[in-house]
From Swiss-Prot:
SMART domains (UniProt xref): SH2 (SM00252)
Region annotation (Disordered) ranges: 45-65, 107-131, 152-177, 237-302
Domain SH2 per the UniProt entry, residue ranges: 347-440
Function (record text): Inhibits estrogen-induced cell proliferation by competing with PLCG for binding to ESR1, blocking the effect of estrogen on PLCG and repressing estrogen-induced proliferation. May play a role in T-cell development and function.
Protein name: SH2 domain-containing protein 4A
InterPro entries assigned to the protein according to its UniProt record, in alphabetical order: SH2, SH2_dom_sf
Organism this protein belongs to: Homo sapiens (Human)
Any one of the GO CC terms: cytoplasm
Signal peptide from the UniProt entry: none
Length: 454
């Protein structure tokens, strides 16, 4: 079964529905391994092909290529988000995203007050510039008056006789006084312009500080309101829980894969698959289970009774194929029998639906109860287990004349009984700690596996 999935790189949705979350993660891990293996084969084939003498291709200018970064194990370097000590926790990332969104929203809200302040500031500048423009004509008028006076004096000098020494002294004194007044006026104008510029800068700086303070306060308010929002809190909790669940499942799948691989290497207690030489080539068909004593010719109906609680979801042809598969391939392997006797194991059941298996387990009310049923969807088995959190289901691969959980084919068992005995002491998964403690047997008068042994 696993080989077929990996060869096609496709799993039927009905089959995927039979898998537990742990088995799904392990299966995805195996499919990823198969992808890498195929990629390496293609790369090796390409290298062999390129090593042959061929006509060199003209290299393009500024040719680009991709080189994978390798880790310490010489494999492609992979960074698993959230597992490194430098990675930010999920809630910290959420807080940063909220803070950034709140800041952008506060900036948008502050855009209108910013425009209003800018217009007021521009109007005040225009008013003050008009005031200085009014002051400027007075200075110019003063200059014009002094200029006219100087021209008049020059004309008078031309018509007058040569001035005396005293007149020259008086003229020089008046000219120097005019120059001093002009210098004082220019200095006053420069001081006014500098003061106006300084006031302009201080006003602009003050307005910017006020707007920034308003933005910061608004950002904090928006961020606080979003964090206190019940819908956002619920969404955050769900996202965080889903992220933690995915991370734990992936980690658990890797741990289970390593644990079972190590168990297979150590060969724990002879539970590994026995050599095919020890299995007879043509084993004899085991005896049928004893029928109930009350079934006589008069009471036995013309049509065999079926478990009325089982709802058949498969077509008759598909169900017949599964029954034929069990009789032809599984009976020679003593599927469903006790390990040391020819009696049917109490945990073995026939073709049961998922709903019926859950009902049987819940009726016991004992965590650790389990049963193995023939799958209603595929040629294989499913182990149903009752834990503290509810019912779990694990698909068992029986495609290679051996039994192992789908996705972890390193540790295989010769019979279903061997698999059950092994997991009475060894948990199925490291996270769930599922130990097979209490077999869940038949509850109806007629066993649900009769059709498999008829």
């Amino acid at each position: 079964m696993l080989k077929q999935i990996l060869s096609e790189m496709y799993i039927d949705p009905d089959l995927l529905a039979e898998l537990s979350e742990e088995q799904k993660q392990i299966l995805f891990f195996k499919m990823r391994e198969e992808q890498i293996r195929r990629w390496k084969e293609r790369e090796a084939a390409m290298e062999r092909k390129e090593s042959l003498p061929v006509k060199p291709r003209p290299k393009k200018e500024n040719g680009k290529s991709v080189h994978w970064k390798l880790g310490a194990d010489k494999e492609v370097w992979v960074w698993v988000m959230g597992e490194h000590h430098l990675d930010k926790p999920y809630d910290v990332l959420c807080n940063e995203i909220i803070a950034e969104r709140a800041r952008l929203k506060a900036e948008q809200e502050a855009e209108e007050p910013r425009k209003t302040h800018s217009e007021e500031f521009t109007n005040s500048l225009k008013t003050k510039s008009q005031y200085h423009d009014l002051q400027a004509p007075d200075n110019q008028q003063t200059k014009d008056i002094w200029k006219k006076v100087a021209e008049k004096e020059e004309l008078e000098q031309g018509s007058r006789p040569a001035p005396t020494l005293e007149e020259e002294k008086i003229r020089s004194l008046s000219s120097s006084s005019r120059n001093i007044q002009q210098m004082l006026a220019d200095s006053i104008n420069r001081m006014k312009a500098y003061a106006f510029h300084q006031k302009k800068e201080s006003m602009k700086k003050k307005q910017d500080e006020e707007i920034n303070q308003i933005e910061e306060e608004r950002t904090k308010q928006i961020c606080k309101s979003w964090k206190e929002d019940s819908e956002w809190q619920a969404s955050l909790r769900k996202s965080k829980a889903a992220d933690e669940k995915r991370r734990s499942l992936a980690k658990q799948a890797r741990e289970d894969y390593k644990r079972l691989s190590l168990g297979a290497q150590k060969g724990r207690g002879g539970e590994r698959l026995q050599s095919p030489l020890r299995v007879p080539q043509k084993p004899e068909r085991p005896p049928l289970p004893p029928k109930p004593q009350f079934l006589n010719s008069g009471a036995y109906p013309q049509k065999p009774l079926r478990n009325q609680g089982v709802v058949r979801t498969l077509s008759s042809s598909a169900q017949e194929d599964i029954i034929r598969w069990f009789k032809e391939e599984q009976l020679p392997l003593r599927a469903g029998y006790q390990k040391t006797s020819d009696t049917i194991a109490p945990w073995f059941h026939g073709i049961l639906t998922l709903k019926k298996a859950n009902e049987l387990l819940l009726s016991t009310g004992m965590p650790g109860s389990f049963l193995i049923r023939v799958s209603e969807r595929i040629k294989g088995y499913a182990l149903s287990y009752l834990s503290e959190d509810g019912c779990k289901h694990f698909l068992i691969d029986a495609s290679a004349d051996a039994y192992s959980f789908l996705g972890v084919d390193q540790l295989q068992h010769a019979t279903l009984a061997d698999l059950v005995e092994y997991h009475k002491e060894e948990p199925i998964t490291s996270l769930g700690k599922e130990l097979l403690l209490y077999p869940c047997g038949q509850q109806d008068q007629l066993p649900d596996y009769l059709e498999l042994f008829e």
